[in-house]
Amino acid sequence: MSALQALSTSRLDGKVALVTGSGRGIGAAIATELANRGASVVVNYANSPDAAQTVVDAIKKNGGDAIALQADVSDVKQTIKLFDDAVAHYGQLDIAVSNSGVVSFGHLKDVTEEEFDRVFAINTRGQFFVAREAYKHLSVGGRIILMGSITGQAKGVPKHTVYSGTKGAIETFVRCMAIDCGDKRITVNCVAPGGIKTDMYHAVCKEYIPNGENLTNEQVDEYAATWSPLNRVGQPIDVARVCGFLASQDGEWINGKVLGIDGAACM
């Protein structure tokens, strides 16, 4: 295979991608990476139109094509409309990346029904119905990528039962969905990041560290880097590149799998 042929299999020219929760952080990096590979991108947001438009503007400035569409994926009716509107605008949809999510910490004894429902509504139920609508709207040979977490795989994390449970369910989803989606040759996979340095990173990361509330942001970075033998923390681009691979022809034989993106971290 020539270098040109190898490059072409990583490209997404002519494809249309939808990324939920892509106004910032990991989602923004995924949307940008898919656009850099040639895809037109639907940048979804729930509550931050300015942030989403910033992502769209950056993609367009770099020669790409993108639009911002609002939808709260905890509301199935909004999810349905999101996919309908995406197809109405671009005429097709080939890639769906479910990135929307919320974090939650709390000892088992303190978890309320409201908190349980809030987290599952987005992280689990929301992702399920994003995948359902993706199956209905995607072209033959499309890609569905769901968002898991190292906490769905790693040893137990204190005060993290609800969040970890929402992510553990996603791993089972993709194994079963991959079979259901086979009739349209759609692959379904899960990316499971470890700690990724986004705007929420330091506040969340302190919850994983004993006495973390007493550490400065610099000390948090130093501590978190030791979780990986590569001695650094994860960046949004680390997740985005894997999503780009899965979305491309290069990833067409990866199906029903959970890909850990954690630098071999052991928390």
Swiss-Prot record:
Pfam families: adh_short_C2
Induction line: Expression is positively regulated by the cluster-specific transcription factor TSF1. Expression is induced by the presence of the cluster-specific polyketide synthase PKS1. Expression is up-regulated during nitrogen starvation.
InterPro entries membership: NAD(P)-bd_dom_sf, Sc_DH/Rdtase_CS, SDR_fam
Disulphide connectivity of cysteines: none
Listed EC numbers: 1.1.1.-
Active site: 149 (proton donor), 163 (proton acceptor), 167 (lowers pka of active site tyr)
Keywords from the UniProt entry: NADP, Oxidoreductase
Top EC category: oxidoreductase
Gene3D superfamilies: NAD(P)-binding Rossmann-like Domain
GO molecular function: oxidoreductase activity, acting on CH-OH group of donors
Protein family per UniProt: Belongs to the short-chain dehydrogenases/reductases (SDR) family.
Protein's name according to its UniProt entry: Elsinochrome reductase 1
Annotated source species: Elsinoe fawcettii (Citrus scab fungus)
